[in-house]
Amino acid sequence: MEITARFVREHLPLIRREYNKYDRGRLLVIAGSYGMAGACVLASRAALRTGCGYLNVAVPKEIYGILALSVPEAVCTVYERPEDLDDAIDKADAVLLGPGLGTLREHICPHVFRKGQKPLLIDADGLNSLANAPRLSGTATWS
């Protein structure tokens, strides 16, 4: 499949001038860890470039400053425990999980997998977590 300008026009919704950020969707990105903040920054910038309206990025406190300076358009949620993500997950229309999580994935991913009920894009370390614990994949109804 070739992705052309025509393909994009036919498959992505038109973004109207009168739309506000909430009309364009609320995305939660759960990404990044010490030494891998770049993955979080790249994923966040990509979300904004593709039309995300409201972007909330959940990061560990060690990389908060990097993200806040690199993606000032994003709202940042700092977490210490997996449960700290619950409110952000509940408010999101969709969740991106995984880029640059590193060893944090061992605690974060199983918790997010169990939450369910939202469109979930699993990437990078999120996929590694799912591969290492396949029984978790059936614990919730993600789209």
What are these regions (language model features)?
Residues 1-5, 58-143:
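Glycine-rich phosphate/dinucleotide-binding loop and adjoining beta-alpha-beta core of small-molecule
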Residues 1-30, 34:
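YjeF_N-associated NAD(P)HX repair module
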Residues 18, 46-49, 68, 86:
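A general structural signal for stabilizing positions within well-ordered secondary structure
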Residues 26, 53-56, 141:
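Residues at the starts of beta-strands that form the adenosine-phosphate
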Residues 35-49, 56, 104-107, 127-130:
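Short glycine/serine/threonine-rich phosphate/pyrophosphate-binding segments
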Residues 46-52, 91-94:
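Short, surface-exposed connector motifs at secondary-structure boundaries
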